[in-house]
Regions:
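N-terminal small/glycine-rich loop or linker at the start of catalytic domains
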Residues: 1-13, 47-66, 101-111, 130-138, ...
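Glycine-rich, positively charged N-terminal anion/phosphate-binding segment
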Residues: 2, 17-93
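Alpha/beta catalytic cores of nucleotide-metabolism and tRNA/nucleoside-modifying enzymes
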Residues: 4, 8, 12, 18, ...
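Hydrophobic faces of well-ordered beta-strands that scaffold small-molecule active sites
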Residues: 12-16, 37-39, 67-71, 95, ...
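Active-site beta-loop-alpha junctions enriched in small/polar residues
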Residues: 17-19, 42-44, 72-74, 100-102, ...
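Alpha/beta enzyme core
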Residues: 80-111, 119-196, 216
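Aromatic- and acidic-residue-enriched carbohydrate-binding clefts of CAZyme catalytic domains
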Residues: 116
Length: 327
C-alpha cells in the first residue's frame, strides 16, 4: 500500500490510543506484525507552547518506520505549526490528524470528533497541515456525530480534496463512543467514494475479524485498536490468516506473560519504574483477559509499585496456569 510516497508493507496498523500506544507497546506490536504504528495523540497547541512532557509521546524506536505521529487541535495555524514540530521531534514518516476522538475534554474544546460538525473548518485544518509538512498527511475520523448526523462519506471526500493521502474511518458515531457495534457498511461506502487508501477501524478483536472487515468493506488496510490490548499476536495471526488461510494458535501462556513483562521493562527504560508500574496495572491485566481464575493476581497487579513485584507475580501466574492446564 502507498500512502503518498510511503510504502506500507502490510495491511494491519496499530491505531493510536491515548495512554496505551506508547513506545514500548508499539515496539511489541511491530515485532508481532503491525506494518504501521501511530503515536498517542498529542496536542498541537501543547507542542507550540513548548510543553516539556508532550515531545516524549512522540519518541519513535530506532527501527520504528514507517510510523505516524498523531496530532489534534482545531486552529489551522496552530495545527500547521504543531505538525512541523511533531515531524521535527519524532522523525515520523506520516502526520495523522485526529478528528475522531469522542472524549468530552477533547470535544468540548472543538477538537477531535467535534470537527465532524464543522467540515469547512476541518478542511482548512487538513489543508494547513498538508501545506506545512513534506510528509503525507492522513486523517482519522468517525461515521458522524450521531445517527442523525452521519456525514462520513462527505467528510472523506472533503479530506481527499483537502490533500489527505489516506484516511481511517472508525465505524461508530461520536455519540456511540465505544459502545454498540461498528458500522462496516459505512466504511464500505467511504471506500467506494474516494481514491486514496482507506483503513477500516472498529470491532476487530480476533484474526477472523480482520479478514471479514477487509472483505466486507474493500478497505486497503485495517487499523486495530482495543483488540490489540494484551494481544499483540493479533497482528501476526491475522497476517497469517490473510496470507495462507490458516490462523496460528496463540503462543503458550508463559510466552504471553513474558511478553507482558518485557513490555513493562521497555516502558520503565523510557519513563522510569514508577510511571511504568502505574501503567502496568492496566497493560498486564489485559494480557490476562483470556484466563479464568486469576482475579487474585489481577488485584495484586493493580497494586504494583516495583518491577521486582511484577517478576514475582509473573512467575506465580505461570506456575498457576501450568498447573491448571495439567489437571
Amino acid at each position: 500500500m502507498q500512502i503518498g510516497n510511503i510504502t506500507i508493507n502490510g495491511k494491519l496498523a496499530l491505531a493510536p490510543m491515548a495512554g496505551v500506544t506508547d513506545l514500548a507497546f508499539r515496539h511489541i506490536c511491530r515485532e508481532h506484525g503491525a506494518a504501521l504504528t501511530v503515536t498517542e495523540m498529542v496536542s498541537a497547541k501543547a507542542l507550540c507552547y513548548k510543553d516539556k512532557k508532550t515531545p516524549r509521546l512522540l519518541e519513535l524506536g530506532a527501527d520504528e518506520h514507517p510510523a505516524a505521529a498523531q496530532i489534534f487541535g482545531h486552529e489551522p495555524d496552530t495545527m500547521a505549526e504543531g505538525a512541523k514540530l511533531a515531524l521535527e521531534k519524532s522523525g515520523c514518516d506520516i502526520i495523522d490528524i485526529n478528528m475522531g476522538c469522542p472524549a468530552p475534554k477533547i470535544v468540548n474544546n472543538g477538537d477531535g470528533s467535534a470537527l465532524m460538525k464543522e467540515p469547512e473548518l476541518a478542511s482548512k485544518v487538513i489543508a494547513a497541515v498538508v501545506n506545512a509538512v513534506d510528509v503525507p498527511v492522513t486523517v482519522k475520523f468517525r461515521k458522524g456525530w450521531d445517527e442523525k448526523n452521519v456525514n462520513c462519506v462527505e467528510f472523506a471526500k472533503m479530506a481527499e480534496q483537502s490533500g489527505a493521502a489516506a484516511i481511517t474511518l472508525h465505524g461508530r458515531t461520536r455519540s456511540q463512543q465505544y459502545s454498540g457495534t461498528a458500522d462496516w457498511d459505512a466504511i464500505r461506502e467511504v471506500k467506494q467514494a474516494v481514491s486514496i487508501p482507506v483503513f477500516a477501524n472498529g470491532d476487530v478483536a480476533e484474526p477472523e475479524d480482520a479478514v471479514r472487515i477487509l472483505a466486507h468493506t474493500g478497505a486497503d488496510g485495517v487499523m486495530i485498536g482495543r483488540g490489540s490490548l494484551g494481544d499483540p499476536w493479533l497482528f501476526e495471526r491475522a497476517n497469517a490468516l490473510l496470507e495462507t488461510g490458516i490462523c496460528p494458535a496463540l503462543p503458550p501462556f508463559a510466552e504471553r506473560i513474558d511478553t507482558a513483562v518485557r513490555q513493562i521493562e521497555l516502558a520503565a527504560e523510557q519513563k522510569g519504574e514508577h510511571i511504568a508500574m502505574l501503567e502496568a496495572r492496566r497493560h498486564v491485566n489485559c494480557y490476562l483477559k483470556r484466563e479464568s481464575g486469576v482475579k487474585t493476581f489481577k488485584n495484586r497487579i493493580c497494586a504494583l509499585t516495583r518491577l521486582s513485584d511484577l517478576y514475582e507475580i509473573a512467575d506465580e501466574l505461570k506456575a498457576f496456569v501450568s498447573a491448571k492446564e495439567n489437571i
